[in-house]
Amino acid sequence: MEKILKHMAWANQQVIGKISELPAEALDAYAVNPEWTVGTIVRHIGSASNWYLWRLLDRESFSAEENLYWEKRREDGDEESPKMQDLKYVLEVLRDSDAQLLEQSRKPDADIPREFRGEQHVFKRSTILSQAVHHATEHRAQAVSALEARGFTSINLDDFDVWSYQIRVGE
């Protein structure tokens, strides 16, 4: 679990970093559904990382300050599609939440009761972490596909797979 979470964090930084180097209109690119632009997808990757972390936290022991902090943090991620200058903030949010997800992976696997799609369920910590990785991966691919559909072809996802992570980072 540790390697794949480290890879996710690295790939998030690399791919979104590459997106930030493109012309501003790249954030408006979409593949099929115009509601899912690259900008919206990038924002969604960042806000979802917060939500997965939120699902793992023991909120019963939160102080009033911690509750306010997390309320604000979760609201920040639900705003409109970012502009190019906002991608730095998205990268910072991801850097923080991805690091905290990695810390969560070092805890023993445990049952975590949560509401999901309007019903109460009990998920394993490892299930939530696995979904966080899967979710980020599928949306990075969605963003790059949307870019390619609109002629922005400079990002090759093969450059950011686990093989490339090991070669570049050495883990």
Predicted feature locations:
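Short, contiguous alpha-helical
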Residues: 2-17, 26-75, 117-171
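Solvent-exposed, charged/polar functional surfaces in cytosolic regulatory/catalytic domains
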Residues: 14, 18, 96, 100, ...
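Short alpha-helical hairpin
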Residues: 19-24, 111
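Anionic, Ser/Thr-rich low-complexity intrinsically disordered regions
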Residues: 24-27, 43-50, 82-83, 87-94
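Helix-adjacent hinge/juxtasegments
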Residues: 60-106
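Acidic catalytic patch
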Residues: 105-118
